[in-house]
Curated annotation (Swiss-Prot):
Role played: Calcium-independent lectin displaying mannose-binding specificity and able to maintain carbohydrate recognition activity in an acidic environment. May be involved in inflammatory and metaplastic responses of the gastrointestinal epithelium.
Sorted UniProt keywords: Disulfide bond, Glycoprotein, Lectin, Secreted, Signal
Disulfide bonds: C29-C40, C57-C153, C128-C145
Organism: Rattus norvegicus (Rat)
Domain annotation C-type lectin: ranges: 36-154
A cellular component annotation (GO) from this entry: extracellular region
Residues that coordinate or bind a carbohydrate: D97, P98, Q99, K100, N101, K134, D135, K136
Protein name as it appears in the record: Regenerating islet-derived protein 4
Coiled coil: none
InterPro entries on file: C-type_lectin-like, C-type_lectin-like/link_sf, C-type_lectin/snaclec_domain, CTDL_fold
GO molecular function: heparin binding; mannan binding; signaling receptor activity
RNA-binding listed as a keyword: no
Signal sequence bounds: 1-22
Length: 157
């Protein structure tokens, strides 16, 4: 049986190409979540402060955290998804300054330095990051972590 499956996958990859095969082999995400490049994303239109949003992301399991957004392409995919639901409210992501010394870190441990800060962002007493709706969620603002707003979670299945 296993050899038949392998042959079928080889045949599919030869006939249909790698794009179709990657769709067939794509890991599944939880209901209501979307897939991009082997990660699952959940956008939640619930109002939570940054810490409670992170706890809620963790409660979904699978190593889920507030989302790390690591490059412009990923940001663009996320932007298009969120704007399908709303265009005016900021959305928490997982970048924060836990030591309150401008040492920004991703809550999931990612080390990428992609940081599209909005030129309008303010620094004082703002240690959590939101996606900025004024720029279609493609730039980010620093904001007070106690503000209650929508949030984006991410995990790798």
């Amino acid at each position: 049986m296993a050899s038949k499956c392998v042959r079928l996958l080889l045949l599919l990859s030869w006939v249909a190409g790698p794009e179709v095969l990657s769709d067939i082999l794509r890991p599944s995400c939880a209901s209501g979540w979307f897939n991009y490049r082997s990660h699952c994303y959940g956008y939640f239109r619930k109002l939570r402060n940054w810490s409670h949003a992170e706890l809620e992301c963790q409660s979904y399991g699978n190593g889920s955290h507030l989302a790390s957004v690591l490059n412009p392409k990923e940001a663009s995919v996320i932007s298009k998804y969120i704007t399908g639901y709303q265009r005016s409210l900021p959305v928490w992501i997982g970048l924060h300054d836990p030591q309150k010394n401008a040492s920004w870190q991703w809550i999931d441990g990612s080390t990428n330095q992609y940081r599209p800060w909005s030129p309008r962002t303010k620094s004082e007493a703002r240690h959590c990051t939101e996606m900025n709706p004024k720029d279609k969620f493609l730039t980010w603002n620093k904001n007070g972590c106690t503000k209650r707003q929508h949030f984006l979670c991410k995990y790798r299945p």
